[in-house]
Amino acid sequence: MSLSRRDPLVVGSVVGDVLDPFTRLVSLKVTYGHREVTNGLDLRPSQVLNKPIVEIGGDDFRNFYTLVMVDPDVPSPSNPHQREYLHWLVTDIPATTGNAFGNEVVCYESPRPPSGIHRIVLVLFRQLGRQTVYAPGWRQQFNTREFAEIYNLGLPVAASYFNCQRENGCGGRRT
């Protein structure tokens, strides 16, 4: 289904800052420990130390997906001039499975925002088939849109995000 103006990805400016509008085509379930990520959920760095379990829907295990995890609010939400920071990149994930069955191109690096409340965005793309994806030379100033264009991934088929701030930070994101 197409995203409405009230969709949390639109309200949270994930669509716009990181992604172009897209239609959700498969389910994406992201779990840290026993907490399932819902759009806008607040998580602390201590809760996201280890990579999450990611489950992908779909009905044909011959379809493959690429998962990208980025922070668009680097170094701070008020001055994101290093947008985006790549935290994780997994390719060749078969439908109906999860990240454990994919190819980890860039290993998971847990979010540790230095200041402010950062959005951590997980984006799922459907691949045209198995393909070789090269790790970028650096994690800073990664661009999800350019990455999708280079590897002919098209628009996302699912996405989710959570908010993360310093362990002793306070307050919530204002939208």
Swiss-Prot record:
Keyword tags: Cytoplasm
Species assigned in the record: Arabidopsis thaliana
Protein name (Swiss-Prot/TrEMBL): Protein TWIN SISTER of FT
Homology family: Belongs to the phosphatidylethanolamine-binding protein family.
GO BP field: meristem determinacy; positive regulation of flower development
PANTHER family given in the database record: PHOSPHATIDYLETHANOLAMINE-BINDING PROTEIN (PTHR11362), PROTEIN FLOWERING LOCUS T-RELATED (PTHR11362:SF9)
PROSITE patterns documented for this protein: PBP
GO cellular component, one term: cytoplasm
Domain of life, per lineage: Eukaryota
The keyword Cell inner membrane appears for this protein: no
Organism placement in taxonomy: Eukaryota, Viridiplantae, Streptophyta, Embryophyta, Tracheophyta
Cellular compartment(s): Cytoplasm
Gene: TSF
Presence of the UniProt keyword Cytoplasm in the record: yes
Predominant subcellular localization, coarse grouping: cytoplasm
Protein function: May form complexes with phosphorylated ligands by interfering with kinases and their effectors.
